[in-house]
Amino acid sequence: MKKQLKYWFSLMGLTMSVGLTACSSNQFVFANFESYVSPLLLERAEAKQPMTFLTYPTNEKLINGFANNTYTVAVASSYAVSELQQQGHLLPIDWAKFNLKKTQNGSNQATIQNKEDAKELFTKEIGDISGELLNWGVPYFLQDLVFVYRGEKIQELEGQDVTWSTIIKAIVNHKDRFNNNRLALIDDARTIFSLANVVHHEVKNTTVDVNPTGSTLNYFGNVYESFANLGLKRDNLNTLFVNSDSNIIINELANGRRQGGIVYNGDAVYAALGGDLRDEINENNLPNGDNFHIVQPKHSPVALDFLIINQQQTHFRDAAHQLIYQLALEGADQTAEELLKTDEEKGTSDEDYYTYGAMQNFSYVNYVSPLKNISDETTGIVFKENKQADTKQVVKQQSQSEQQSESAEKEETEQDDFYTATLKSLLKADSLDDKAKKLVDTIKKTYKIKKADNINWANLIEKPITPLQRSNLTLSWLDFKQRFW
């Protein structure tokens, strides 16, 4: 596997810009968050359907883009999907158009026709979360918030049932490690509110829910101040590093300039692999199993993103389904072994070229794929050692029987799981030392988004809020940052 870069990219022949522009509804527009799609895959998709590519920083900008008919296809978090569906802006997903096959008697046979059929493509967690949203969107990636820290282990953060309130207290108790701008957080009002609400409920010992129950400025302010009440404020930590660009935070955690960060698990994994600038990091600061730690709290906000289609652009119905298939579903009904096939001649210095689009996208984005053949704990490529099927090195002069014999031998060998192979490639090593193996274990553990049976997933997913709630949430966030962070 080649080094994966998340630098912003430009592709020949593909028009891209940031934010909303005056796009005609006759233009096919794909909109997404930055660095949230493989450049190689986007190039492949554009070859089939010419398009304009736009980016946006928040779901709120996305909602506006659908309402004013700017976007054809976009990536949206679950609450934005619900809100857009309620407003009548979404075209239903026609699952039959993807021509994916259901598994029957151990083989792929009947075509998937609807959301109920489609559930077999995804992990159990996706089925628990998505519900009726599968009528309106195709799952893209799954994430939850985690805490990353560098250096020696903090004993309070060891164990299975660590809470966010425990993490906040540990940060304050070890402020010599995190003060002076060395604790990083995402500058996103809704995400930080959801986290604050988790802390709020944990402290009050009430049922955890990330969603607001009130709508006043005072209500939102009180929830945000749950952080300050536990000591997470300027008075204790001097200053905090709050930034809206997750890539900056990833790279700062990877090189050790920031000693702690509250990020999504996919970003934590990418930081563990060295981020964008791995080759520039001093060897002593490179992440390893002893100096890079990821804490997955018992209750934590979960985000499931979907690909959706604009109801106002039915003339792009077929092209929209084709794009979604390439980005999220191509290879979804294949075996794990098939999914790993690459074409070395078509790859670049930054990306391997995978035959199937869903694998291409996962290998670049590195967030939790909803697909069973990638993320299932027993059969998915992230956790499973797969049979090695590559026989390209067989010498042409060999007899057919010799080739078949050698092929059979190759098929009996085992190939590393995805992240072991990735780290070996980054280290340019045939094997991993103990620290590297510990880091792989940390990454694979972080990749799993597991909740206890008594925890309701629905309470950890952000739901639509009213315009008044959105306005007061944003104003309260700005006020809280100014006063405390």
Curated annotation (Swiss-Prot):
Q: Where is this region: Disordered?
A: 393-416
Residues passing through the membrane, by range: none
Q: Where in the cell is it found?
A: Cell membrane
For whether the record's keyword set contains Nucleotide-binding, the answer is: no
> Can you locate the S-diacylglycerol cysteine lipid attachment residues?
23
Q: Name one GO cellular component term.
A: plasma membrane
Residues spanning the signal sequence = 1-22
UniProt biased composition (Low complexity): 393-406
The UniProt entry, under InterPro entries, shows: Uncharacterised_lipoprot_MG045
Q: Which SUPFAM superfamilies match?
A: Periplasmic binding protein-like II (SSF53850)
Residues carrying lipid (N-palmitoyl cysteine):
23
Its record classes its membrane topology as: Lipid-anchor
Kindly state which keywords UniProt assigns to this record, in alphabetical order: Cell membrane, Lipoprotein, Membrane, Palmitate, Signal
Q: Which Pfam families match?
A: Lipoprotein_8 (PF02030)
Q: Which PANTHER family match?
A: SPERMIDINE/PUTRESCINE-BINDING PERIPLASMIC PROTEIN, SPERMIDINE_PUTRESCINE-BINDING PERIPLASMIC PROTEIN
What name appears for this protein in its UniProt entry? Uncharacterized lipoprotein MG045 homolog
